């Protein structure tokens, strides 16, 4: 069987859903989202009045009249909407240019067809205003009848008459304002007359009437005034209407801002209607029928009120236009002092204080509701909750009024270029009223108040169900307690004293609204007979239900009770004199309290109206007033119009740009100022679009207005996301740049007084980045996703810029590139806390074009710079271990042409202009040389694959063509120029003689024209290639060692711990291993991972451990590859004649290099560049590498010409000038180069011998006999094989 679930259980299950946490839990920094919900409207407009037959018949009749007047008010609202939202049609309709135009008839027919429905609306409007004036004047006439003057008129009825006065004022001002209505009707009438559509006299007369009605200014106002002046005593009734408005305004007997402003408009227009030839309002003031001083104070505090939409009016203007206006009676309103309404900063402290107090109280109540469950709260708790809800609505209404009143005042008081220096002279009217009419402080205050309104609206809407239930229970209990209990005493006295009218009214109240427990009034109640209760009291149990009274019920109860306390009651004396004072106070208190019940019962609608700020977007009045004109250029300062003679262009448009729209002005102000305290409020001004769209659909019911709101929202939100994304990226990029900046450098800057504000202030972007579903025009927008998309693009641009910047510089830019990428990585890490950005390494690969290609832009540019600039133009110095650019360019290649990096904002580089300057200074240190920092950066950026590619290309495209090309050709040429034989002269010749000997034999080599240019340049390029490969390997080895040290802790590798005496190192080592056991990758993966994961972990661990232990050497491979290129016979020469070694012959490369070394050891004159300055040590490295690879090192060291001069000079110590060469200077140079060559040979031999086996230290010795003197050597036996000699001796 299916289990039955009670309603209580079902409801409790639904309430449990509130405990479910949303997956995103985004901070609430936006207004109430618009949801699709069912709203029940229990306002019946007195349709159920006939059901209350027990009520006083007079008030039921009044309810009938009320219902009819409300229908007229609703119809008037529709006509007001029609007029306000009217857009000029005639401007869009083509007009015939001449009477001979062939399609003139067709144009007129289409004009009539298009405009006929709109003209019918205007006719209906004219008929309506007649009907409404007749109905209003009829009611005034009825109430002003001599027999009715002393009759009681209810507060609600007087308020309805006030609403009529307000309606007439609004309709009249709208009709006056809309010139497009007159233009459209003129266009229609012209077309209709041409086509003779209006043929009958009645139609013509109505057309004429409509034309006059539209053309006459203040037609409705004057008609109402003329009609009322014919009614005797109308001023007394209007005095009551004005007085009730004054009373309600001063006692805050209103709830929505619209009602508050309506009261003020009724005061102004009502006094204007009263002031006539027959009635002087100043005399009425003297008679105390009205209080002008109180109204004057109200008019001063509220100089301007919204009229309709963006239309506004100064109520005091009605008084100024009255017949008996006396400025002395209006001292405050006539003064030039600015109204408090115009200064939002005056209201702000109190608003903040009220907001904090109320939010605290509401939060406490919300926490209490969510943490404790009470099935039936007490009456006191319900009353507190209802009061809390009412106070919240009142605060919201008050704050909304402050905003709309300020906006209205600003619209009526636009600024100009004299008051605001930022306002251009040619700024148009609406622009001066909105864009330039608010100071920065006012904008921030406006944003803050709007945020308070929208934020509180969200909080109250969240607990709407709880509040509404408490409101209904409280209203029910208070109404029933009052009717069933509090009215017993006045009823008893009325029965006892035979006050039949009072008794009948009280009985009607009880019968209308009492909800007796048994369904009927107790028959044995002593009160009904005027008797006292028994000694034990008469017990009446009042039920408690969750239901409120109907609108008609509430109206009947309040009106009948009001009749008991009113000053007018229709008789000679008022009824209140017959009621006990205590009871009278109870009735008045109940009457005042119940005024708000209709608002509370419609809590949702009231909350919406109290927070409605749609007025801040609408601009129909200004569109009509300016007709969309924008003055592009006019040389004269005046109010521009179409007749301006100096006007060059006047553009017409149907809408204002977003820069003049208040929602965007406020939103953009936050984004422009980047004020941290306001950043979390940035979504609240955008909610003004929600209000405007809601108003367009529910009140105006105009699709085109909604479309315009939607179009602006589309544009503004795109701008908002774009600007916000740029700001967030710039903020975090600046933060990353500040974090990455060298701390010592920053400290030195601060010491020197250069403060570049490196660390940006916290701007509270985190809250915005957590917004996953921003509600805008019914759309749920993932702001986080949109910002992520844009910041992803910005990250790509930033990385792209870093690489492009490197491509625009020489090889020294590699250090800055690494820094830029690291700053971007930090920025990416900071942003990744809130945004799902692409993988940073993937971004770098994509920007580097290295996703699928074996090498990327960085590798390619490194090689290009090496090939065309670095290898050919840089000189190496072993003392500093750096390359520097040569002073003279001897390269045959053209200078490299680099593209300029793209121009982008500062934040794409390092984050800000100041940081860019700081980093430019910091990385400027690395631009004058290429050294260890550059090689380390290359290793980290290129990686193994990039390094392998670069080295492979260097060998194939640079080294091999050099060796087998230019160097080979030069070697062959110079070998021919070398002497056939060049001996080592004996020491007896002395060092000057030896030098002269070599100088004479090597004349051709010394004087060879290309030796010190092309030949040495080729050797320099070759040597630089070798040095580059060596330094790259050294840097790579250091990086690998660093990786190993970093990984040691995770591989169970610990440094030997320090041990005290009598402490075993093994025990301490074990404690260390146990302490860091959780960090051991392999063991942990083997425990909790799969077999495949464990295998991968073991292989990774093995690779990390053995990477450097294998003794792998890139440089050895490089040398062996180079050795393979030295395959031409010219390098080794022909076999020696003696079968052993060339001693005096110049047929091997080392002899040529000895000659070249003799050339560059010759001292230069004072003004010439030395070989070291021109070519660096790459020249020496090239020769030494080739000598070692050819196996000629020992021969070179033994038979070198320069070394021989050095050895001889050390013995004799002579210093002479030998044919222009200072011997001592040359010997000094020889010694330096000998040391350098020894170092190079040492390095090369270390790498080349590192690859041999363990027995490589065993030398293969060949035995030769000692040399003999030529005189004892026979011609036939110049040389004997030692083996043969041994054999002959044995034989």
Curated annotation (Swiss-Prot):
In terms of one coarse class, where is the protein primarily found? cytoplasm
**A biological process term (GO) from this entry:** regulation of cell shape
Record localization? Cytoplasm
Which keywords accompany this UniProt record? Cell shape, Cytoplasm, Developmental protein, Differentiation, Neurogenesis
UniProt region (Disordered), positions on chain? 1269-1291
Q: Which GO terms describe its cellular component?
A: SCAR complex
- What this protein is called in its record is Cytoplasmic FMR1-interacting protein
Q: Which organism is it from?
A: Drosophila pseudoobscura pseudoobscura (Fruit fly)
């Amino acid at each position: 069987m299916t289990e039955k679930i009670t309603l209580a259980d079902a409801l409790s299950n639904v309430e449990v859903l509130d405990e479910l946490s949303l997956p995103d839990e985004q901070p609430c920094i936006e207004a109430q989202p618009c949801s699709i919900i069912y709203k029940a409207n229990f306002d019946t407009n007195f349709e159920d009045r006939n059901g209350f037959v027990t009520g006083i018949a007079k008030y039921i009749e009044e309810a009938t009249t009320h219902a009819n007047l409300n229908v007229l008010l609703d119809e008037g609202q529709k006509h007001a909407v029609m007029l306000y939202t009217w857009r000029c049609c005639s401007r869009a309709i083509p007009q015939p240019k001449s009477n001979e135009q062939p399609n003139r008839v067709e144009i007129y027919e289409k004009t009539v067809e298009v405009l006929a429905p709109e003209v019918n609306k205007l006719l209906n409007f004219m008929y309506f205003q007649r009907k409404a004036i007749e109905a209003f004047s009829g009611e005034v006439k009825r109430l002003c009848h001599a027999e009715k003057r002393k009759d009681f008129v209810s507060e609600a009825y007087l308020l309805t008459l006030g609403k009529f006065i307000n309606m007439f004022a609004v309709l009249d001002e709208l009709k006056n304002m809309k010139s497009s209505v007159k233009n459209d009707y003129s266009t229609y009438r012209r077309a209709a007359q041409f086509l003779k559509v209006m043929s009958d006299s009645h139609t013509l007369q109505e057309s004429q009437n409509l034309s006059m009605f539209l053309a006459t200014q203040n037609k409705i106002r004057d008609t109402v005034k003329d009609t009322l002046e014919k009614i005797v005593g109308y001023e007394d009734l209007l005095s009551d209407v004005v007085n009730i408005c004054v009373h309600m305004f001063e006692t805050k007997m209103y709830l929505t801002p619209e009602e508050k402003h309506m009261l003020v408009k009724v005061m102004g227009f009502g006094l204007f209607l009263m002031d006539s030839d027959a009635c002087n309002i100043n005399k009425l003031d003297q008679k105390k029928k009205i209080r002008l001083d109180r109204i004057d104070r109200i008019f001063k505090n509220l100089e301007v009120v919204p009229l309709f939409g963006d239309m506004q009016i100064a109520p005091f203007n009605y008084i100024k236009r009255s017949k008996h206006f006396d400025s002395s009676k209006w001292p405050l309103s006539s003064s030039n002092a600015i109204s408090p309404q115009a200064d939002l900063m005056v209201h702000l402290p109190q608003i903040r204080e009220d907001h904090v107090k109320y939010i605290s109280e509401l939060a406490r109540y919300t926490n209490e509701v969510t943490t404790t469950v009470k099935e039936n709260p007490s009456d006191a708790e319900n009353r507190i909750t209802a009061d809390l809800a009412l106070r919240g609505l009142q605060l919201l209404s008050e704050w909304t009024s402050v905003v709309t009143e300020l906006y209205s005042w600003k619209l009526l008081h636009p600024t100009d270029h004299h008051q605001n220096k930022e306002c251009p002279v040619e700024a148009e009217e609406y622009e001066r009223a909105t864009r330039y009419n608010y100071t920065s402080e006012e904008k921030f205050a406006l944003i803050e108040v709007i945020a308070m309104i929208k934020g509180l609206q969200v909080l109250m809407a969240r607990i709407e169900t709880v509040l509404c239930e408490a409101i209904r229970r409280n209203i029910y209990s208070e109404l029933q307690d009052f009717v069933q209990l509090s009215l017993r005493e006045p009823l008893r006295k009325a029965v006892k004293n035979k006050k039949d009218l009072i008794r009948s009214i009280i009985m009607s109240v009880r019968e209308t609204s009492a909800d007796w427990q048994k369904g009927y009034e107790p028959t044995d109640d002593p009160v009904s007979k005027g008797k006292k209760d028994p000694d034990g009291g008469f017990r009446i149990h009042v039920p408690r239900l969750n239901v409120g009274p109907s609108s008609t019920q509430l109206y009947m109860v309040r009106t009948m009770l009001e009749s008991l306390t009113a000053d007018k009651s229709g008789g000679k004396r008022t009824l209140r004199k017959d009621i006990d004072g205590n009871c009278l106070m109870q009735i008045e208190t109940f009457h005042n309290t119940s005024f708000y019940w209709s608002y509370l019962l419609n809590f949702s609608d009231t909350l919406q109206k109290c927070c409605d700020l749609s007025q801040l977007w609408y601009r129909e009045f200004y569109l009509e007033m300016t007709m969309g004109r924008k003055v592009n250029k006019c040389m004269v300062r005046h109010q521009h119009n179409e007749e301006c003679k100096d006007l060059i262009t006047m553009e017409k448009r149907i809408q204002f740009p977003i820069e003049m729209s208040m929602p965007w002005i406020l939103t953009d102000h936050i984004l422009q100022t980047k004020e941290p305290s306001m950043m979390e409020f940035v979504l609240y001004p955008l909610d003004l679009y929600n209000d405007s769209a809601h108003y367009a659909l529910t009140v105006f019911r105009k699709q085109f207005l909604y479309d315009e709101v939607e179009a602006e929202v589309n544009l503004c939100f795109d701008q908002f996301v774009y600007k916000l994304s740029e700001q967030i990226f710039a903020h975090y990029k600046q933060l990353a740049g500040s974090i990455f900046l060298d701390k010592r450098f920053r400290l030195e800057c601060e010491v020197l007084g250069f403060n570049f504000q490196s660390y940006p202030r916290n701007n509270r972007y985190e809250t915005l980045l957590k917004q996953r579903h921003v509600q805008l025009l019914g759309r749920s927008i993932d702001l986080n996703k949109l910002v992520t998309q844009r910041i992803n693009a910005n990250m790509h641009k930033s990385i792209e810029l870093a690489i492009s910047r490197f491509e625009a510089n020489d090889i020294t830019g590699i250090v800055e590139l690494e820094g830029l990428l690291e700053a971007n990585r930090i920025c990416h890490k900071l942003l990744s806390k809130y945004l799902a950005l692409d993988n940073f390494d993937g971004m770098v690969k994509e920007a580097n074009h290295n996703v699928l290609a074996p090498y990327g832009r960085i590798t390619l540019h490194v090689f290009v710079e090496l090939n065309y600039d670095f290898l050919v133009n840089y000189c190496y110095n072993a003392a500093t271990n750096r390359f520097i650019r040569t002073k003279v360019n001897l390269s045959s290649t053209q200078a490299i042409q680099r593209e300029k990096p793209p121009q982008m904002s500062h934040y794409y580089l390092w984050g800000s202009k100041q940081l860019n300057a700081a980093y430019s200074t910091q990385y400027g240190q690395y631009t004058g040389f290429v050294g260890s920092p550059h090689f380390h950066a290359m290793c980290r950026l290129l990686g193994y694959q990039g390094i392998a590619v670069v080295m492979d290309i260097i060998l194939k495209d640079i080294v091999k063509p050099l060796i087998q090309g230019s160097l080979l050709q030069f070697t062959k040429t110079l070998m021919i120029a070398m002497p056939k034989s060049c001996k080592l002269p004996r020491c007896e010749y002395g060092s000057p003689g030896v030098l002269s000997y070599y100088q004479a034999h090597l004349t051709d080599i010394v004087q060879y024209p290309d030796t010190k240019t092309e030949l040495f340049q080729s050797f320099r390029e070759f040597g630089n290639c070798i040095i580059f490969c060596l330094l790259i390997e050294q840097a790579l080895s250091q990086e690998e060692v660093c990786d190993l040290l970093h990984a040691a802790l995770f591989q169970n590798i610990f440094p030997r711990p320090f041990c005290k005496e009598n402490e075993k190192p093994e025990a301490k080592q074990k404690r260390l291993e146990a302490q860091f056991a959780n960090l051991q990758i392999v063991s942990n993966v083997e425990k909790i991972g799969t077999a495949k994961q464990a295998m991968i972990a073991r292989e990774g661990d093995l690779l990390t451990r053995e990477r450097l232990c294998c003794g792998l050497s890139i440089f050895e491979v490089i040398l062996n590859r180079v050795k393979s290129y030295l395959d031409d016979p010219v390098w080794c020469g022909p076999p020696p004649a003696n079968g052993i070694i060339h001693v005096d012959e110049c047929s091997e490369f080392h002899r040529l290099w000895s000659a070249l070394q003799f050339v560059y050891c010759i001292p230069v004159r004072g003004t010439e560049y030395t070989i070291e300055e021109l070519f660096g040590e790459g020249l020496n490295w090239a020769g030494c590498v080739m000598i070692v690879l050819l196996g000629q090192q020992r021969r070179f060291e033994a038979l070198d010409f320069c070394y021989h001069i050095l050895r001889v000079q050390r013995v004799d110590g002579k210093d002479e000038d030998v044919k222009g060469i200072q011997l001592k200077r040359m010997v000094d140079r020889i010694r330096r180069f000998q040391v350098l060559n020894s170092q190079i040979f040492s390095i090369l031999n270390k790498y080349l011998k590192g690859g041999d086996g363990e027995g490589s230290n065993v030398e293969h010795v060949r035995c030769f006999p000692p040399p003999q003197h030529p005189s004892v050597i026979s011609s036939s036996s110049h040389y004997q094989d030692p083996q043969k000699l041994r054999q002959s001796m044995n034989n």
